Amino acid sequence: MSTTLGVPRPDQASYMLRAAASDAGRAYKQRLLELLDVRAGHTVLDVGCGPGTDLPALAERAGDTGAVIGVDRDPAMLARARSRTAELRRVEIREGDAHALPVESGTVDRARTDRVLMHVTEPLDVLGELRRATRPGARIGLAEPDWDTLIVDSEDLETSRAFTRFTTEEVVRNATVGRGLARLAGRAGLRVEAVDATTPVFRDFQEADHTLGLGRNLRKAIDGGHIDRARGRDWFAGLAQGPFYASFTLISVVCSR
């Protein structure tokens, strides 16, 4: 298949920053920030902080008497996060894995993960680490997509469904973890305080191709025999011609320790 189908895979940091800057990204991030209720003096932990997208907003709320810790295991992400927060003296960037957080037990007032659990090996173990790191009464915010809810409008409904099925079964490790956040939080010994669902909507084909990986994941599906080559090409060409619509559900859960 031609490598010109869809946009090339962007570097992960650029992808995360662009997704966060979209209308849908800004909306759910602001909602999660409000539910997390970060206050002056709090110690805040951002697990899987990536290039530091959310660290400035957390630092602003924690104030001069608070502290923000960003944790990621990717050295390239850590470098971007350090650069982004170089002027924020109360922000510390640490290298570490979400399954074994480099944070002392019971030292955190607020913690969050954002589109991290869908990638990890054991989501329940990560939630257990968040519980360990937080103080009694602390709040933990979680946000994850449910990729089984991915809708791509097309007259070829069968191929749209095949694309979603391929995404959930072959592309994303924990593709439906979003719907299970409240259940998993309870199993980890956390008390669920709020559950919120938002629906990011894409009307611009190019933006959707960048964020949802329509072209690059379609190539994988065709190469793997999951979608017929000619039919997949026709499906993609129809999406590009428009009018375009795609959406998915993103679930946010706030828990207390």
Give the residues covered by each predicted segment.
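Class I SAM-dependent methyltransferase SAM/SAH-binding core
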Residues: 45-47, 51-100
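Conserved catalytic/acceptor-binding region of the Class I
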Residues: 22, 139-205, 220
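N-terminal, positively charged/glycine-rich alpha-helical extensions of SAM-dependent methyltransferases
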Residues: 1-15, 26
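Conserved Class I S-adenosyl-L-methionine
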Residues: 191-257
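A short SAM/SAH-binding and catalytic strip from SAM-dependent methyltransferases
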Residues: 109-123
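A short glycine-rich, Lys/Arg-flanked "PGG" loop and its adjoining helix->strand segment in the class I
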Residues: 124-139
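Conserved alpha-helix/loop element of class I SAM-dependent methyltransferases that forms part
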Residues: 23-40, 57
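A short acidic, Gly/Pro-enriched loop at the edge of an enzyme's catalytic core
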Residues: 99-110
